[in-house]
Amino acid sequence: MPDDPAAPFRTRLPEARSAPNRLADDPAPHGPAPRPAGPVLRPGVTCWRTARTGRVAVLVDGAEYFAAARAAMEQARRSILLVGWDIDPRMRLDPDRAETLDRFLTRLMRSRPTLHVRVLKWDMPFPIVLEHPHDPLERLDRSTGRRLNARLDSELPVGAAQHQKLLVVDDALAFCGGIDLSFDRWDTAAHRDHDPRRRCPNGEPYGPRHDVMMMVDGDAARALAELGRERWRRATGEAPEPGPAATEADPWPAEVPPVLTDAIVGVSRTMPPFGPPSSRNPAIRESEALTFAAIAAAKRTIYLENQYFASARIAEALARRLAEPDGPEVVLVLSMESPSWFDRMAMDTPRAVALRCLRMADRHGRLRTMTPVTEGGGPIIVHSKVIVVDGRLLRIGSSNLNNRSMGYDTECDLTIEAPDGDGDGDEGGARGGDVSAAIVGVRDRLVAEHMGVACGRLAAAVRGTGSLIAAMDRLQKPAGRRLVPLPVDDPSLTEQAFAALRIADPDRPEEAWAPWRRVPSPPRSTLRAAGAALLTVGAAAGLWGLVRRSALSRAGRGRG
């Protein structure tokens, strides 16, 4: 059944508010997992389910993802489902073409009588909505017929964000990762200092940006379609029908080669508890459990790329591994600093504390905390959410390494795991078979891009040294495109207290408006510093509201 064209853009139907979450299994246990003896992917614990995919592709940076997304949607016959933190109809999938996303979707819908398009964006609160206005999406919804529907998702605890980023075509092909279809996400792997194609709808340029998506088909795509339909149902009260198992055409983009075929993919979620007590959707923390299990399972190398690194518990789990005499290397790639001043206050301050925790534990010299720079030495925003453990596990999704991604926001991550025991080394195909080779190949591709060297050269250096860090040190360049160490900042007492309070970064809904619950019995000096931090953030929040009133036409930077 097509959606009702008269359905409200912002609000949902009342009967869906109390509907149970049909996807909710038992939530994952809270906190670090013990070192797993078997597979890291365990349905009901570290993932919702595992599903087979005929092909897996990893799309690095916005240009590659947008081209694949455009090609896939061009093949759509029955359905396109878009779920995002931000979806802006004014963006262009190809900056060299005049066609915007709204015109592209409208053209597809009007040319195919059986195609239904559903677009679901987080109902952002003030002041974030000033930078990511809802008006363009509402105009798209009002200007099209009953087969193209755009809605806002507000079915979350107050302050929580809908952070999943999904695109599903005909229930046959799906994308998941860190990239929203928004205006400041496009960039190439070259990350040029000044690329005239990196412009917002108002003509304002934005800086280089690195991100990653995964593309899957088969049962894995159908699992993401089910997740997306459930998200739509919870937000709107409407339940789209699943598509048939067989599709008329293969939407896989012909120009995108798979990195792996015939694989098993784990789908992990984060969903906060929400709803009235009689039909409350339980907390789902599979991505959190997966993060700790992956860290615990590592034998030689943990490679992390992320927008944030603000979780004290994740830092402590990594620190424990660094303290082991024969533990794994840890390579962490982050932005030089968050682009938004609010994120610098809320996320970079606890990041400094977390990084100090790692440095103090690194008695054996197995830690590298790095940031990528352009050919001219300028910063590159790292927005990707990637975990690679040895040749054993690759996770790509929407989850940040902060607290709210563990249990407060909605998240979705995809994971590929090599058969138990096959991916312990870094040599990939030399020891671990096709799955391990693909996992190591993705990691080496990412590191090589950041370092400005050929992927084959990095892979050879890893094989020759037996160490990712040794290979990186060997290939390090004094100038040009490269990875440079993150600056060492020792946080003050006030900054430590601010980090402990986790302002804007709660772990669960009950902590959101009670930051004092996050710090168990701190000493008196820390309490005084915490009070100062609260006064500071209160004054800053008030100033933020005033300043952001002038930002309606400006592009948001770095969030999502």
Describe the predicted segments one by one.
Residues 2-560:
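Charged, low-complexity intrinsically disordered terminal segments
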